[in-house]
C-alpha cells in the first residue's frame, strides 16, 4: 500500500470515512464543533462532540489529519488528500476482485451497467 511518502495508508471505518469526507468537502482547517455539525447534517447523525473527537483522534493517529493547537483552540488540517485515498481504495478493489486487471474490472462494470440500463426495455418491431 503506497501513499504519498511511501508509507502505509490505513483503512478507514465507515464512521471515520464520514468524518473524513466531511472534512475533505470543506478543505480548510476546521474546529471540532464545525466538523461535528456538518457531519451530523450531512449524514443524519446525532453524534456528540466526544464521539466526533474520538474519530478525529483516530484520523490523526492514522495520518489523515494534523491537529494544530493554538491555546485551547484546536483545528484540523488535511494531510492525505481525498484523491489519494480514492486511488488507493480503487487499486485495492481492482486487485482483490479482478486480480489486478483494470480491463476485467471495466468489462464487469460495463456489463452490469448495460444490463441494468436495458431492464424493462421492450424491443420494438
Which residues fall in each region the model found?
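Key DNA-contact positions within bacterial/archaeal DNA-binding proteins
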Residues: 50
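Short, cationic-aromatic polyanion-contact patches
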Residues: 70-89
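A short, conserved structural fragment
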Residues: 60-70
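Short alpha-helical segments that sit at the start of domains
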Residues: 1-29
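Short helix-coil junctions and helix-kink-helix linkers
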Residues: 37-47
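Amphipathic alpha-helical dimerization/coiled-coil segments
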Residues: 88-125
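Short, hydrophobic-biased segments on the C-terminal half of alpha helices
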Residues: 53-57
Amino acid at each position: 500500500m503506497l501513499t504519498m511518502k511511501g508509507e502505509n495508508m490505513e483503512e478507514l471505518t465507515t464512521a471515520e470515512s464520514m468524518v473524513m469526507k466531511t472534512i475533505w468537502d470543506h478543505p480548510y482547517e476546521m474546529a471540532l464543533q464545525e466538523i461535528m455539525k456538518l457531519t451530523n447534517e450531512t449524514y443524519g447523525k446525532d453524534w456528540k462532540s466526544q464521539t466526533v473527537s474520538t474519530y478525529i483522534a483516530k484520523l490523526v493517529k492514522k495520518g489523515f489529519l494534523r491537529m494544530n493547537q493554538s491555546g485551547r483552540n484546536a483545528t484540523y488540517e488535511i494531510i492525505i488528500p481525498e484523491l489519494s485515498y480514492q486511488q488507493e481504495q480503487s487499486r485495492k478493489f481492482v486487485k482483490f476482485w479482478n486480480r489486478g486487471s483494470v480491463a476485467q474490472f471495466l468489462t464487469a462494470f460495463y456489463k452490469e451497467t448495460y444490463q441494468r440500463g436495458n431492464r424493462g426495455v421492450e424491443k420494438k418491431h
